[in-house]
From Swiss-Prot:
GO terms for biological process: carbohydrate metabolic process; glucose metabolic process. GO terms for molecular function: magnesium ion binding; phosphoglucomutase activity. InterPro entries: A-D-PHexomutase_a/b/a-I, A-D-PHexomutase_a/b/a-I/II/III, A-D-PHexomutase_a/b/a-II, A-D-PHexomutase_a/b/a-III, A-D-PHexomutase_C, A-D-PHexomutase_C_sf, A-D-PHexomutase_CS, PGM. The lineage of its organism: Bacteria, Pseudomonadati, Pseudomonadota, Gammaproteobacteria, Enterobacterales. Binds 1 Mg(2+) ion per subunit. It catalyses: alpha-D-glucose 1-phosphate = alpha-D-glucose 6-phosphate. Its EC number is 5.4.2.2. Pfam families: PGM_PMM_I, PGM_PMM_II, PGM_PMM_III, PGM_PMM_IV. One of its GO terms (cellular component) is cytosol. It comes from Escherichia coli (strain K12). The gene is pgm. It is found in: Cytoplasm. Substrate binds at residues 146-147, 156, 308-309, 390-392, 409. Its main location: cytoplasm. This is Phosphoglucomutase. This enzyme participates in both the breakdown and synthesis of glucose.
Length: 546
């Protein structure tokens, strides 16, 4: 992808959304019956779209909220539904729509007091803490399109295990929501917001303080405080600003929030690689503001708007997410003595093979799963996975005692873990990675995209290993051709080809007419580029007939 000529530069007035217009479009524009682009598509990250594109409007959210209310009733979930929202412009009207429908369905709802914002991990944690006490089970809804641009909206559902809903649940919600849309919302129960707030079904609580105080159960906050590290946080205008403020105060940390603005245009952002405003804390372009301040701090952090992702900045720059995952795993499994010896590491099959080498050295079991955090939920929930992480800078891990903290991605604990590592060892995570690279080799990793039609994407997701005729990759014998994940046998929706010195994986994009290729080599950049070239050839050959 070509880099935009203003990538990494501050946003200008001409880059900003018109919040009033976008909000009006939420209420005025309607999805067109029979138009697939306007339908509800409920993946594990929920449904995402934009009001301007007729894909995230009031009818969508009313239908989704009704479908969730029916699904939880069908499954006997009668406890509270924790509803959180992030700072995107469309999150506010969608939040109102959800409350109107849930209250009309007699669902008890818990929201952050004073109309505050709630990160994804705080919703997951609240669900788990509530359900541990026994009694009627709680679940949750988070209104967020994650790191997507300011014009986008999103909504996702977390069942009582606290994690992202599995496909069998999301398919039911999607189908029912689309049926309600097709029927003109006739089956949707709804009362006004005033009636909802007066119904007794909507309860306001402070969800911030219990989360902040609970952090001592999962991260060595005392060590961070004692070390006196200078920490910087750029909340990127997201849902966790109040959380970072209270963390600094409660644990008496030397923590500076470099920008505490909430602005639905996200005008304080630097433009991403493609020139868009995108709150991606793993992008050097989007993180240019915090990177310019890196010499002022021992460590600096950022999160995306719903705080399920992390960005770690050392004086050397922004850490590669794959590199930090390897460091986090290496540290945690040597500093959590209460975790049993059978506790495993979960990784997605497009994450770096450096993780494989670290886990093997630790003598731990590695469970490699398809892309998507949903594959880690059960393992984190029952304590059989100590850690689960994705190359897209999303991860979670267990408390000190081996019980779950958040079964969804938690950007806050991953940032604080970087501080713990630095405080306890005297070396920051980048320095730890440099040591791992000396021991295990320094892999060269890249992800690229190539255009693909819908038919080609469908063909790629249905590949079988024998359809790959090549016997070598970049000069090395192919040791494995995978279309199912080795950790759980689930389809990977694509292909992974491995050698002793490198690998590539190809899978269709869930949101664009393209497929993604992930490549890695332990023999350097030139070797990786050869893998990339041959990967494109292998995939093109397979797709030629599609």
């Amino acid at each position: 992808m070509a880099i935009h000529n203003r990538a990494g530069q501050p946003a200008q007035q001409s880059d900003l959304i018109n919040v009033a217009q976008l909000t009006a479009q939420y209420y005025v524009l309607k999805p067109e019956a029979g138009n697939a682009e306007h339908a509800v598509k409920f993946g594990t990250s929920g449904h995402r779209g934009s009001a301007a594109r007729h894909s995230f409007n009031e009818p969508h959210i009313l239908a989704i909220a009704q479908a969730i209310a029916e699904e939880r009733a069908k499954n006997g979930i009668t406890g509270p539904c924790y509803v959180g929202k992030d700072t995107h412009a469309l999150s506010e009207p969608a939040f109102i729509s959800v409350l109107e429908v849930l209250a009309a369905n007699g669902v008890d709802v818990i929201v952050q007091e004073n109309n505050g914002f709630t990160p994804t991990p705080a919703v997951s944690n609240a669900i788990l803490v509530h359900n541990k006490k026994g009694g009627p089970l709680a679940d949750g809804i988070v209104i967020t399109p994650s790191h997507n641009p300011p014009e986008d909206g999103g909504i996702k559902y977390n069942p009582p295990n606290g994690g992202p809903a599995d496909t069998n649940v999301t398919k039911v919600v999607e189908d029912r929501a689309n049926a309600l849309l097709a029927d003109g919302l006739k089956g949707v129960k709804r009362i006004s917001l005033d009636e909802a707030m007066a119904s007794g079904h909507v309860k306001e609580q402070d969800l911030v303080q219990p989360f902040v105080e609970g952090l001592a159960d999962i991260v060595d906050m005392a060590a961070i405080q004692k070390a006196g590290l200078t920490l910087g946080v750029d909340p990127l205008g997201g849902s966790g600003i109040e959380y970072w403020k209270r963390i600094g105060e409660y644990y008496n940390l030397n923590l500076t929030i470099v920008n505490d603005q909430v602005d639905q245009t996200f005008r304080f952002m630097h433009l991403d690689k493609d020139g868009a405003i995108r709150m991606d804390c793993s992008s050097e372009c989007a993180m240019a503001g915090l990177l310019a301040l890196r010499d002022k701090f021992d460590l600096a952090f950022a999160n995306d708007p719903d705080y399920d992702r992390h960005g770690i900045v050392t004086p050397a720059g922004l850490m590669n997410p794959n590199h930090y995952l390897a460091v986090a795993i290496n540290y945690l499994f040597q500093h959590r003595p209460q975790w049993g010896k059978d506790v495993a590491v979960g990784k997605t099959l497009v994450s770096s093979a450096m993780i494989d080498r670290v886990v093997n050295d630790l003598g731990r079991k590695l469970v490699e799963v398809p892309v998507g955090f949903k594959w880690f939920v059960d393992g984190l929930f029952d304590g059989s996975f100590g850690f689960g992480g994705e190359e897209s800078a999303g991860a979670s891990f267990l408390r000190f005692d081996g019980t779950p903290w958040s079964t969804d991605k938690d950007g806050i604990i991953m940032c604080l873990l970087a501080a713990e590592i630095t405080a306890v060892t005297g070396k920051n995570p980048q320095e730890h990675y440099n040591e791992l690279a000396k021991r295990f080799g320094a892999p060269s990793y890249n992800r690229l995209q190539a255009a693909a039609t819908s038919a080609q994407k469908a063909a790629l997701s249905k590949l079988s290993p024998e359809m790959v005729s090549a016997s070598t990759l970049a000069g090395d014998p192919i040791t494995a051709r995978l279309t199912a994940a080795p950790g759980n046998g689930a389809s990977i929706g694509g292909l992974k080809v491995m050698t002793d010195n490198g690998w590539f994986a190809a899978r269709p994009s869930g949101t664009e007419d393209a497929y993604k290729i992930y490549c890695e080599s332990f023999l350097g950049e030139e070797h990786r580029k050869q893998i990339e070239k041959e990967a494109v050839e292998i995939v093109s050959e397979v797709l030629k007939n599609a």
